[in-house]
Amino acid sequence: PGDVTINGLDLGALTSKMDPDDLRQLADGIDLSMLISGAWPMVVLGFVVFFYCLGSLYDERKDRSVLFWKSLPLSDRDTVFSKAASALLVAPTLAVGAAIACMFAFMLLVSAFVLLHNGNPVSLLWGPGSPLANAGLLLASIPVYALWALPTVGWLMLCSSWSRSMPFLWAIMIPVFAGIFISWFEVMNVFDLQSAWFWKNIVARSLLSVFPGTWVDVMDIGAIA
């Protein structure tokens, strides 16, 4: 059979002989490709949760559907908690399910391609790769996401509850202008901190924490590599 290459790896050479370095390189490439193939549902998740929280309470007041919720035997607290749970648990669970489905669909598609070229998908893909470990990693990220996204979800729902109009602008402008004020007057110097600390830990955390993976920069990557 003719040689086929995927991501720069020669399938013919790998089939005939693989040393430990080749096997490690192949496994890394497969795992990375799987994670990339399942990335788009996680990106969509960030935008969906952002705008869902932003309109969760504002839209009800606008179209008076809040009257429907008040007619149910639920307190306002229960209503808010249910919406927060939808954003923090239900939405990421659905996104992770879609991401896992995309990863396995990608593996099946590449397996069919390998079979068509007389390759062995078990030894070239499923063996070196870690599809179950990657799926477990995504599932384990759900509680991490729920905790990490909580500041943004809380801030957006707060803006949604009290803003009379344009909750998006209020949600963006307040932390951004606060950051500009802090930077302009160097307020953080009082605490022996740079203005960048406020932008990273207050502004960014209040607006961007609903996007999966934004917690990576605060982790010790070497510890999990």
Residue ranges of each PLM-predicted region?
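Low-complexity, proline/glycine-enriched hydrophobic segments characteristic of transmembrane helices
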Residues: G2-G29, Q194-A225
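Secretory targeting signals
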Residues: S16-F47, S82-S161, D220
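Short helix-to-coil transition segments within interhelical loops
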Residues: S71-D76
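Transmembrane helix segments
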Residues: L132-G136, S165-G213
